Amino acid sequence: MAKVLAINAGSSSLKFQLFEMPAETVLTKGVVERIGFDDAIFTIVVNGEKHQEVTAIPDHAAAVKMLLDKLIRYGIIRSFDEIDGIGHRVVHGGEKFSDSVLITEDVIKQIEEVSELAPLHNPANLVGIRAFQEVLPDVPAVAVFDTAFHQTMPEQSFLYSLPYEYYTKFGIRKYGFHGTSHKYVTQRAAELLGRPIEQLRLISCHLGNGASIAAVEGGKSIDTSMGFTPLAGVAMGTRSGNIDPALIPYIMEKTGMTADEVIEVLNKKSGMLGLSGISSDLRDLEKAAAEGNERAELALEVFANRIHKYIGSYAARMCGVDAIIFTAGIGENSEVVRAKVLRGLEFMGVYWDPILNKVRGKEAFISYPHSPVKVLVIPTNEELMIARDVMRLANL
């Protein structure tokens, strides 16, 4: 038995899960929020019970020390030596990483080199890696990249129709995100379908505050909706998704905003928040729409419409589809969005059951047994995917 920590470090947060492998049992999980503040919040779940403490946590290294001390204090481990491996989520691996990798100084250097592609996320992920190196220097650590799964996309999927040298000189191309999630749910779908993944054409819909769709053929990503950044693709909670690029200078001219300010609007004030004027939270929008708010209903329709179009596009791209998967916060829990997305797809063999579609947050088929195209809800488990990669790469 091995104990493996799965870590997701943000700029002021640290999410963690401790697994016993290979049984894949979750021993504990939690989050440290507001790192760098005097009122940081440490939350840990032990035996289903949530424990919380508000205290000063000056930096990520202090958060790591506190986490390990708590694991001992709550009797989850007896000493630091019981941690056999650590897996770190890293948002962007560029073209350098097509798989998870054991962390070395050279790997850290390469992650730093691609950090300009994810300036909000990669530096924070690296801070988490460094913090664990400081406290547990001899424990093998693995970097698991959100972009790696999509490195199997062919050129016709990942290239933009821009001057080719923009790709060769500046690395401008589609990278795609949520790869760890898309990989987990498509592998799980193959298990639930009882068919080898090599034979399947799957469309994975990761729908959370950030949302992306992936076409997965034979277990490999061949296209995905997000692009060079996570701003592209479908409309999201606060992100615009795809727009006409000529709108950026037009908006600058009309509003007097700078390019950076327009990008800020596209990232943080657009999507369902921008359309509804109410909220980026789908639960608020569903409630408002049910009460007759037309703009909330419009935001939901736009969100579903964009996903619906990607499903049709990817079915054409793969010359058919065997199953459609819904995952992440909205995909797992919103029967309203799933119904709007699936509406009208009968022409391609999608027949779904409104009763089965009431499922929330657990694995289920929501298509009729006779439906040629199966529809599944599969809660994502990126942390488990990270732990599995640690086991594989650290030979635990």
Curated annotation (Swiss-Prot):
* EC numbers: 2.7.2.1
A biological-process GO annotation:
acetyl-CoA biosynthetic process
Look up the record and name the pathway of this protein: Metabolic intermediate biosynthesis; acetyl-CoA biosynthesis; acetyl-CoA from acetate: step 1/2
What cellular component terms from Gene Ontology apply here?
Answer: cytoplasm
UniProt keyword list: ATP-binding, Cytoplasm, Kinase, Magnesium, Metal-binding, Nucleotide-binding, Transferase
Listed binding positions for Mg(2+) are N8, E382
Mind telling me what this protein is named?
Acetate kinase
Query: Gene name?
Result: ackA
